[in-house]
Every structure is written in structure tokens, then in C-alpha cells.
């Protein structure tokens, strides 16, 4: 199924966190990452924390296709805002999984 030109591309990001850092990670994420990502043109679709498993899952999107997402991602990765957000930060993510995903059921849909 190919997306329509006006569709958005969503990237799912899943992190296994270093034990004991979840609260610090969440504070940093809210204060630094969300503002930098949104300033670069991304939409944060959702973010969930699993305290018991010390995992964090979130998604960002960009209007358009995967090429548009990749182009904006490269701009973000090279941005001063991202560099500042990560400057001096300890390692909090032990393992990450990042992939582009497709919508199967729209948020708020009822089965």
C-alpha cells in the first residue's frame, strides 16, 4: 500500500533505557527533544513509558513520503538545536530500534 502524496511518514522509536534513568530521561525528553524536534518540523505523535520494563516508545512524523522524512531527519541530525540538546548528556539509552512504520488503524478508531 503506497501512501498518498499528502500522507505523513511516521518513524517509530523504541528504547531500552539504562536501569534507573527513566525519570531523568523523561525530564530531558520533554525539556529538550520535543522542542527541538517540533522546531525542525516534526510532529510528536505519541510517547509512552513502560516503567516496569524501563522502556520508552515514541513516534515522530513529517508530512509527505519517506524521502521527505529522511531529508528532514538529516537536517535535524546536523542541527545546532540537536547538538545542544545532547551536549553533556549521559548515556541513557542502552538499545534503540528505529524504523519507518505504516498506519494500520487510525488513532481514535473504533473496531
Where are these regions (language model features)?
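Short, flexible turn/loop "capping" segments at secondary-structure junctions
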Residues: 4-9, 49-52
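Long, low-complexity, Ser/Thr/Gly/Pro-rich intrinsically disordered segments that act as flexible linkers
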Residues: 49-51, 90-111
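Short, structured motif recognition centered on aromatic/hydrophobic residues
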Residues: 9-14, 25, 37, 56-61
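Basic/polar N-terminal segments that are highly enriched at the extreme N-terminus
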Residues: 1-7, 106-111
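Short catalytic/ligand-binding loop motif for oxyanion handling, primarily in non-cytosolic enzymes
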Residues: 55-56, 67-68, 108
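An amphipathic, aromatic/His-enriched active-site/gating alpha helix that lines ligand/cofactor pockets
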Residues: 4-5, 27-46, 61-99
Amino acid at each position: 500500500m503506497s501512501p498518498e502524496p499528502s500522507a505523513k511518514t511516521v518513524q517509530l522509536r523504541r528504547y531500552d533505557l539504562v536501569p534507573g534513568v527513566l525519570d531523568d530521561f523523561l525530564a530531558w525528553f520533554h525539556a529538550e527533544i520535543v522542542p527541538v524536534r517540533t522546531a525542525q518540523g516534526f510532529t510528536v505523535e505519541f510517547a509512552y513509558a513502560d516503567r516496569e520494563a524501563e522502556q520508552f516508545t515514541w513516534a515522530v512524523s513529517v508530512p509527505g513520503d519517506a524521502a521527505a522524512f529522511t531529508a528532514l531527519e538529516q537536517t535535524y541530525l546536523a542541527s545546532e538545536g540537536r547538538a545542544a540538546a545532547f551536549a553533556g548528556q549521559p548515556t541513557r539509552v542502552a538499545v534503540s530500534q528505529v524504523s519507518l512504520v505504516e498506519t494500520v488503524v487510525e488513532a481514535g478508531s473504533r473496531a
